[in-house]
A protein has these predicted regions:
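RNA substrate-binding interface of SAM-dependent RNA methyltransferases
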Residues: 14, 41, 69, 74-168
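Amphipathic alpha-helical repeat scaffolds
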Residues: 5, 95-103, 212-218
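Short, hydrophobic beta-strand segments that form beta-sheet elements in well-ordered domains
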Residues: 2, 22-24, 142, 160-166, ...
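Structured adenosyl-cofactor binding patch, chiefly the S-adenosyl-L-methionine
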Residues: 68, 106-110, 119-136, 192-231
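N-terminal positively charged helical leader segments and presequences
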Residues: 1-61
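General small-molecule cofactor/ligand-binding pocket signal
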Residues: 45-49, 143, 162, 202
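Active-site/ligand-binding-proximal alpha/beta "capping" segment
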Residues: 162-210, 214
């Protein structure tokens, strides 16, 4: 995959991700010295290209002048190893890349054990997702799974499923040691199978008549409440 932009490339280099090569626009090299130094420390090959040629390869509207070829893919449920107490943030067909990236960033910041992207969710490796995650995907376990596989994993590993639903009460006391908070699609919400498997439905109290919250915002509030109850 390709990581583009000074911040994202530096995050990949600092997180120890396998960066195979860097491409730098010739006119931007002087402004990218910290990135070039980090690449040199890692022994990463750096190629230079004229600005016009670089811009043709870049995906952003205003390219900053650096992109990296990175070997990174989400993990599978078989790769997940949970401690005695662990919280997972699970995305059920969340389709907006900005929401997916924001949720990964939130899960990392709040100390979740992993973010799980169920089938129908935007590709966690897409550039827009990685950019919204602000490098968190390189430091925080991100898993792709079909619902059936995750449900089997949860059952086998004593992971209780909590479903984020509009109009429900916020997380209360009595959090299980292992917990998966599942947030649904921006429009359709959670699939019926998730609701059927959920031990509890939780939500964010809102004023009457208020529009529903953005999926990433609701996830951040609920995950904070869940994690706060663990301390």
């Amino acid at each position: 995959m390709v990581a583009e932009g000074r911040r994202l490339v530096m995050d990949a280099l600092e997180a120890g991700v396998n960066v195979k090569a860097l491409l730098v626009a010739e006119d931007a090299a002087g402004q990218l010295q910290p990135v070039l130094e980090a690449a040199a420390r890692r022994g990463v090959t750096v190629e230079r290209a004229p600005r016009r040629a670089f811009n043709e390869l870049a995906d952003t509207e205003t390219p900053s002048g650096v992109l990296a070829v990175v070997e990174w893919r989400p993990k599978t449920v078989a790769d997940l190893s949970l401690g005695a107490r662990a919280t997972l943030l699970v995305l059920d067909a969340v389709q907006d890349p900005g929401n997916v990236g924001g949720m990964i960033r939130t899960a990392y910041a709040l100390g979740a054990a992993a973010t799980v992207a169920l089938d129908g969710t935007a590709d966690p490796g897409a550039h827009k997702v990685l950019r919204a995650a602000m490098g968190a995907a390189f430091r925080h376990p991100v898993v792709e799974a079909r619902w059936a596989d995750f449900a089997a994993f949860a059952q086998a590993n004593d992971v209780a499923i909590w479903a984020a639903c509009q109009g429900r009460e916020p997380p209360a006391e009595g959090r299980p040691d292992r917990l998966a908070l599942v947030v649904g699609n921006e429009g359709a919400g959670l699939r019926p199978e998730v609701l059927a498997a959920a031990a509890r439905q939780v939500g964010v109290p809102m004023q009457p008549g208020a529009e529903s919250l953005n999926a990433a915002t609701a996830a951040a509030i609920l995950l904070y409440e869940v994690m706060r109850g663990r301390h």
